[in-house]
């Protein structure tokens, strides 16, 4: 111990210089000496750096050896954790390196820290940290008081005063959206209004999770809304979906009503919000799992879905026109059921728009792909023409045929109905690969089974015919969304159904 204390300071300086020269870790995992890892032969593995330190106090010396993960190397070029430090009564010497077991060394000590401070110096040493801690605590209390932390707790009440300068008292979401569709650009609420709404929403409960993040039920001025919260990793998906929802003239009763998009920074992390209408029945997938449907209910679900897709696919020409849009991820989990028993299409994060003037498609730079179970044959075998917009519309039609099959199975006639199942449930595993789906759909040319009982009911017979014409291997032979909508409209009139 005394010999170590006598080691000159130049050696410590050279060690620190060597540490600074080796701060950038290699790509391969490091094996480091770890004095606490008794079960692993005193060895740990990291993608960052090996670390060793010695802390000297007035009465003892503490040695520490371990791994530092790459994520903890802040800033990257000169991490704080690798810098020596000193506090009253203790001195810590550190060394970081990036070679296997390079931290299996004993750092030199610099001698016991001196405590021989004069009265003035001692007062300054004590008062400085105390003042710093007090100021820091006051600052933290102020920040916490003025921010709404939404992830871990739900506030008891909203602060309506925040939106008064922009949105008058008594204004409802329906009023705002009506004003926007009749007198605005038709491309969504102004950004300031969107931000004002988003920042005065009170989250109530989490109602679902997905690959993008979470969905919450929230309240704005007593009205229920759905809040889709994307993690910061999914910024592209959030931006793309918000962009598509704000396409001119997109609003339609059978497409999920978009309200606002905002990025909310709570001081620790950024959350990306997408606010929309709330539908308590949830997705069509959830609805069909819980309930059977009547013939009328089946037709309403199918016709409203076809109406929403027909509006998406349709191009509206004019100064306030709308480009044709293909969904690319249509499935029962991305269709919501409204209170009146009709559907609206949601989750437009993968959608693509067609510019007819230049005949181009704005395919988003997004790593996500559609759901394998609902992929059309030409998508599965990679024969789809990505430059031809009609190809994407035809793939949507194939997927809608599968959704219709899910709905028709739950149609109860005389108390007889099938259990809810996903398409191809009897032919592929629960999470099929593209190869498994390709073998069934493209090679074996199989499609979901249509029960014989459907032939005894006119409505089910029409539904079965539509499905078959949606499932053709040749995409060009499939029905269009508009044709399906017209066929189902005629069926609803025959059945005396009022939509």
Swiss-Prot record:
Membrane topology: Single-pass type I membrane protein
Stretches assigned to the Extracellular side: 30-122
Activity control: Kept in an inactive conformation by FKBP1A preventing receptor activation in absence of ligand. CD109 is another inhibitor of the receptor.
PANTHER family: TGF-BETA RECEPTOR TYPE-1, TRANSFORMING GROWTH FACTOR-BETA RECEPTOR TYPE I AND II
Family: Belongs to the protein kinase superfamily. TKL Ser/Thr protein kinase family. TGFB receptor subfamily.
Subunit-level organization: Homodimer; in the endoplasmic reticulum but also at the cell membrane. Heterohexamer; TGFB1, TGFB2 and TGFB3 homodimeric ligands assemble a functional receptor composed of two TGFBR1 and TGFBR2 heterodimers to form a ligand-receptor heterohexamer. The respective affinity of TGBRB1 and TGFBR2 for the ligands may modulate the kinetics of assembly of the receptor and may explain the different biological activities of TGFB1, TGFB2 and TGFB3.
Protein name (record): TGF-beta receptor type-1
